[in-house]
Amino acid sequence: MTANKGLKVLGVIAGLAIVVMAALPTILHSAGLHPTYEGPTYELPGQRALIITTSHGVLSEPGETDGPPTGVAASELTHPYYIFTDGGMSVDVASIAGGEVPIDPQTFFYAVRSPEDSRYLEDSVAQAKVANSIPIADVDINQYDVVFISGGWGAAYDLAQSPVLAEQVTAAYYGTRNPVIGGVCHGVLGLINAKDTDGNTLIEGRRMTGVSDKQVKELGIEVTPLHPETELRRVGAIYEKQTAFRDMFATLVVVDDEQRFVTGQNQNSGSEASHRMMQIIAERDSS
């Protein structure tokens, strides 16, 4: 092969690589990542939503403190935030420790970044709420009509481990505003230690979903201390899921029979879960 032909081949390869990289977001979206919500939307002016996130920002091995940066998955924060705000709701952001919420930097990678993620990166108001989140211990949970718990790998380290969060979920469930409580992906770990008035697990016997053990294994992130499918089954929830050739392209939203809990399987489920939560409130208020 002559030098000129070699350069031409390299040029073709480089061109193809650029085309594939440019098309990658569309390819992933078509495969099922961050599906476009096509259901009904609702307006809830004057009502309030609380989004709760992890405060843990390191993907560490058991017993270690160092590791790659992690935190909340961007879309699991941005999707509910903008769905609630666009529906006229006032939205607050809380976290286990308060202060700046760590957002997993990989979830802002161009190929997996959603339109809501891009909107957040230009939104100084939303960024200020995330930088100055309310400590979960300081939250007056009875001020909210919706309580949404975001996931991400960081959530595996501190949601279920927080007795204060468990108490807040219990208080929300029995509170005067009768809020709809939800979570997606690892966010559902924030529900597993909430108790009913008899001291039993609040979500026992309820239909729920969360990220599957299969997806955790496929992504190679098994070092986290808790896995939602395993934990939901352990506490007696009725676990449901959808599957795909890779579960990161699957999605499922489950509403429990009482219509008090709405859970989403993974990062693809935040939009539908948020809309379903608003739907329950809208229909309840109109009845």
Task: Specify the residue positions occupied by each region the protein language model found.
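Catalytic nucleophile serine of serine hydrolases
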Residues: 185-187
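Conserved, well-structured core segments that form or line functional sites
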Residues: 181
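Extended, subdomain-level signal for the structured scaffold at the beginning of enzyme domains
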Residues: 2-178, 189-287
